[in-house]
């Protein structure tokens, strides 16, 4: 059980849900420059497994690291933190 707590958990925004049972999540983080101290924002996209196809574009979701599910999928959807507002 303690092994599960060591898996990486990220929170990000869904940017694509066009694939079946797969979402693309954009995770934005900040790093501080070692010399100047300025915070630099950078982002990375992860593909995550969404078994029920419940996440939509714009949702804020939490994803967790898991075993390789395909050539590019290494994460699975844990929960939808905030649903997107549809105008």
Curated annotation (Swiss-Prot):
Q: Which PROSITE patterns match?
A: RIBOSOMAL_S17 (PS00056)
A Gene Ontology cellular component where this protein is annotated is:
cytosolic small ribosomal subunit
Q: Name one GO molecular function term.
A: rRNA binding
A GO BP entry is: translation
Matching entries from PANTHER family are given as: 40S RIBOSOMAL PROTEIN S11 FAMILY MEMBER, SMALL RIBOSOMAL SUBUNIT PROTEIN US17M
Q: Spell out the subunit comment.
A: Part of the 30S ribosomal subunit.
Family to which this protein belongs: Belongs to the universal ribosomal protein uS17 family.
Q: What is this protein called?
A: Small ribosomal subunit protein uS17
């Amino acid at each position: 059980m303690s092994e599960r707590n060591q898996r990486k958990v990220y929170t990000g925004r869904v940017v694509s849900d066009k694939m079946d049972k797969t979402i693309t999540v954009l995770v934005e983080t900040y790093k501080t420059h070692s010399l100047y101290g300025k915070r630099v924002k950078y982002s990375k996209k992860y593909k995550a497994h969404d078994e029920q196809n419940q996440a939509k574009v714009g949702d804020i979701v939490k994803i967790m690291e898991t075993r390789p599910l395909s050539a590019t999928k290494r994460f699975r959807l844990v929960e939808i933190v905030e649903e997107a507002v549809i105008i």
